[in-house]
Amino acid sequence: MKVLFLNTRKKRIDCGTLLRIGRRPDVIVLAELLQGSQRHYEAGLASAGYENCSQAAFHSRKRHLRVYSKLKLETDTRFSRQGNKLQNNWVRCRIKGVTISAVHMPTLGMKRKPFNQLKPWMSKQGACRALMIGDFNTDPAQDPKWGPQLIEWVNDFGWRNLWDKASGGTKAYTFKGTRKSDKPRRIDHAFVGKRLPKARLIHLPAFRLKGLSDHSGLLVVL
């Protein structure tokens, strides 16, 4: 099973291009979708055989997460919303025996509650068939508080950081803003539990290099 994550930055990427650069994954998780782009991706991906598995949204939030899948979801209670800070920004589902948790963290001073909500879930799922993927808005090398905290939880709870063996090593980054003062950062991450020992990460910078988003895509092969 292949799972693609991409922060679209509210852009409407041609779905054929999305699938080609994303190497035709089985499951697609997209972040930062306005209502218009939600309709764009739902229609375009439906024609390619993907079902919009997410609950309906009645209002527009820039960090909406949406899950599109060619594979059947194994649970009816698919998604959880965890408090105001992660409402609509944390979705969980189970596909082919794997729990997929997709996250889009807030920025700056709004991270404390969301990270504290992630901690107990991470502690329970580290020994399981679980994938945690998304835009954490946290570069471990540049965020002095939450970067080390995230990596500490990953290590303490038995998760594996898929960046450790990904192409590009420590020099790879996933985000570069448009302002001159913006530094390249690795803020998109993928972690797997102990029962997914063969999982690997493929970094897809073409989304960023071609101007389709200012984020790279992450493709996890399970």
Which positions does each model-derived feature cover?
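Structured beta-strand-rich core segments of catalytic domains in phosphoester-bond hydrolases
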Residues: 32-105
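N-terminal, active-site-proximal structural segment of metallo-dependent hydrolase catalytic domains
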Residues: 1-47, 62-63
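Active-site neighborhood of phospho(di)ester-bond hydrolases with catalytic His/Asp-centered motifs
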Residues: 28-32, 54-55, 131-135, 161-165
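Acidic/histidine-rich, metal-coordinating catalytic segments
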Residues: 128-142
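Active site of divalent-metal-dependent phosphoester/diester hydrolases
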Residues: 51-70, 140-198, 202-212
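Catalytic metal-binding/acid-base residues of hydrolase active sites
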Residues: 9, 34, 104-106, 136-139, ...
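Surface polyanion/phosphate-binding segment centered on an Asp-His-Pro turn
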Residues: 208-222
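Active-site-proximal beta-strand elements of phosphoester/diester hydrolases
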Residues: 1-10, 92, 96-107, 133
